A protein has these predicted regions:
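Selected alpha-helical membrane-embedding segments in polytopic membrane proteins
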Residues: 3-113
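Hydrophobic alpha-helical transmembrane segments and adjacent short intramembrane/lumenal linkers
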Residues: 92-184
Length: 185
């Protein structure tokens, strides 16, 4: 999912290949390393469960900042859309060009969902199954990514509301969700 997201934004913004590689290596290596180290130490009983939460926290922080980079890219997309003069072309591009490409990272979420469902035998419990599907489903992720972008475009373009209000209004709930998930999870 992370690779798909980076690929999407690198294509969209024509990023240099060096930045593309560094971003992938940095994000993936730290997240994967924290997960592997935590799992190995717990399985070998070298650390207790509470200490392992430190590694989980590191992984969550890295994921949070990676999401922040993606949101920054989304803001640049929205800013570019707002600057377009032809509304028909603007929304045509948004639907026909960018939204289909956005499906690339959602494939990662779908595979992660299937992995968790079968690994944890979520079918044995409807509550567990609903929890897994709710946090990983393609619809939920598309809502988190696409709706705020559309909201900012609409508020800025049609209601002439400045970015100082439009951005917090549309992205604020998503940030709160991530913070809540980081603290509680």
């Amino acid at each position: 999912s992370l690779f798909g997201g980076v690929l999407f934004y690198s294509i969209l913004f024509d990023m240099r290949i060096i930045s593309f590689v560094v971003w992938i290596v940095y994000s993936f290596s730290i997240s994967f390393l924290s997960y592997v180290v935590s799992s190995e130490l717990i399985s070998n009983r070298l650390i207790d469960e509470p200490i392992s939460k430190v590694f989980s926290l590191i992984e969550s922080i890295v994921t949070f900042f990676a999401s922040g980079f993606m949101w920054l890219a989304y803001l640049l997309i929205v800013k570019r859309l707002v600057s377009m003069s032809n509304d028909e072309i603007k929304f045509k591009l948004l639907f026909e060009k960018w939204t289909p490409i956005l499906l690339i990272p959602t494939l990662g979420y779908l595979s992660a969902t299937a992995n968790v469902v079968f690994r944890e035998k979520a079918f044995d419990s409807i509550d567990t199954l609903m929890s897994v599907v709710f946090t990983n489903t393609i619809i939920f992720q598309m809502v988190l990514l696409v709706v705020p972008a559309y909201g900012i475009v609409i508020l800025k373009k049609y209601y002439e509301i400045g970015y100082n209000f439009a951005v917090p209004y549309c992205i604020g709930p998503v940030v709160v969700f991530y913070l809540f998930n980081l603290i509680v999870g």
